[in-house]
């Protein structure tokens, strides 16, 4: 494989080594030496994931305003759902009416860079580029050239109801055994409601399930010679899957076939005590749009406003992921698209994101991230992390929902852990080696 994709250990080391990193000498979004772009009468189309709409829409709007003031061009932002965005992107890229800017997860980006879906970018034009996190910038680079720009990183944490913990005489758990003990106590105290979940865990939440797998020493797949083999059938991986499935069975509630896309909204209904989610979802559980179908409607407090906090999930390593932004090769507005990315990823935008409990795209900003109230748990969670297999076709595994289907088969009882893992291994190997 020609991609230089940073491994999880390198990303963790990058995060932990922030104090040793200096500032950037790169040309920034306020560079006045660059020739001004005239975008009057033009509109660029930006595809961002729904996270930005629900958690930091004001950051998007600020970048749009600064971009329009500088170029005269307008911006149309279309928010995408994680569940189907790759299928939609593939279909769109096959035609000519393509988005100018596309957000992809850092595990998804390599396939599209390798296939030529994104245009080459001048790395020096983006602020803090000398200090980009390797786990985000690695998937952007091919043969010494840059094809996307790091957007943000994040780690998952334990989100919990402070009022329910206090009523049960509990403190934030510091070991996995304490997590289970807390779940038992909360279930005993609040279990009269069939809707109550001591620990809400969607059954198709593969980022969570694979974290439990890694906690037991397992992994998803490994390279054997020149072939990939699935490793979910190995004893450690099965132990992690079983431990996770037991959590779902004993402490969750509701439709076990769901994924995590709306778990913050479900937690906000007030019937759950614990959740495993992004640091920024602490805020998403407490304020939501008055009209869920109108992203411009006012934010209103939920039932759990002021009753939610976060802590590192003890004993469970976090998937340390994030997103990158690319300019479509078929875009007719490549210069303007790159300019928009410049504003959306500059220091002003990144510092605004810190308040949302996400990690910035550059090491020189990490000290500021750790100092932001509410970001402490996310920064600590990043110290124990894992990453997906470094396979060029990994995005195809995600697109086919292989892990989600395997997990649904387990939690619905359709298959045993052993049988589901064997099926998953076969599908993963077939996809990665195809």
Could you tell me what each predicted segment is?
Residues 38-40, 123-134, 191-192, 197-199, ...:
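Short, solvent-exposed loop/beta-turn-alpha elements that line the ligand-binding surface or hinge
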Residues 99-100, 128-164, 197, 308-317, ...:
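A structural signal for short loop-to-beta-strand junctions that line the ligand-binding cleft
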Residues 183, 227-256:
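Glycine-centered hinge/linker elements that transmit conformational signals in sensory
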Residues 147-150, 156, 180-229, 265, ...:
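Extracytoplasmic/periplasmic solute-binding protein
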Residues 38, 106-155, 180, 215, ...:
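Hinge/lid segment of periplasmic solute-binding proteins
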Residues 2-12, 18-111, 123-128, 256, ...:
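Conserved N-terminal structural module of periplasmic/extracytoplasmic solute-binding proteins
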Residues 356-360, 377-427:
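C-terminal capping/gating helix-and-loop segments adjacent to ligand/active sites or protein-protein/ligand interfaces
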Residues 49, 109, 242-332:
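Extracytoplasmic/periplasmic substrate-binding proteins
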């Amino acid at each position: 494989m020609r991609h230089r994709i940073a491994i999880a250990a390198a990303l963790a080391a990058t995060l932990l080594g922030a104090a040793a990193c200096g500032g950037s000498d790169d040309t920034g979004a306020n560079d006045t030496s660059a020739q001004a772009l005239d975008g009057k009468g033009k509109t660029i189309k930006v595809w961002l994931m729904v996270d930005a709409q629900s958690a930091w829409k004001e950051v998007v709007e600020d970048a749009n305003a600064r971009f329009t003031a500088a170029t005269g061009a307008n911006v149309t932002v279309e928010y995408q759902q994680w569940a189907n965005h790759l299928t939609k992107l593939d279909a769109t890229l096959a035609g000519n009416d393509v988005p100018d800017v596309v957000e992809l997860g850092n595990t998804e980006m390599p396939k599209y860079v390798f296939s030529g879906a994104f245009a080459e970018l001048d790395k020096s034009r983006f602020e803090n580029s000398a200090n980009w996190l390797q786990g985000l910038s690695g998937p952007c680079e091919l043969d010494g050239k840059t094809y996307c720009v790091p957007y943000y990183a994040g780690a998952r944490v334990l989100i919990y109801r402070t009022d329910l913990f206090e009523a049960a005489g509990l403190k934030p758990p510091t070991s996995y055994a304490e997590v289970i003990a807390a779940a038992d106590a909360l279930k005993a105290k609040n279990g009269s409601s069939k809707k109550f979940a001591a620990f809400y865990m969607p059954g198709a939440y593969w980022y969570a399930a694979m974290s439990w797998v890694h906690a037991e020493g397992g992994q998803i797949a490994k390279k054997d010679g020149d072939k990939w083999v699935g490793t979910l059938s190995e004893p450690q991986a099965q132990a992690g899957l079983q431990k996770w499935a037991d959590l779902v069975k004993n402490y969750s509630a509701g439709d076990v076939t769901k994924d995590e896309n709306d778990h913050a909204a479900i937690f906000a209904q007030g019937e759950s005590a614990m959740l495993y989610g992004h640091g920024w979802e602490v805020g998403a559980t407490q304020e939501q749009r008055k009209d869920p179908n109108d992203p411009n409607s006012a934010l209103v407090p939920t039932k759990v406003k002021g009753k939610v906090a976060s802590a590192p999930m003890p004993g469970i390593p976090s998937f340390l992921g994030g997103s990158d932004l690319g300019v479509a090769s078929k875009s007719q507005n490549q210069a303007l698209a790159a300019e928009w990315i410049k504003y959306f990823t500059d220091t002003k935008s990144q510092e605004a994101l810190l308040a949302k409990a996400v990690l910035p795209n550059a090491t020189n900003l990490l000290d500021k991230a750790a100092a932001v109230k509410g970001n402490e748990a996310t920064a600590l969670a990043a110290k124990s992390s894992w990453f997906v297999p470094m396979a060029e076709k990994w995005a195809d595994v995600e697109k086919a929902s292989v892990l989600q289907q395997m997990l649904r088969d387990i939690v619905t009882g359709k298959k045993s852990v052993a049988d589901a893992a064997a099926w998953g291994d076969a599908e993963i190997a077939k996809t990665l080696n195809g």
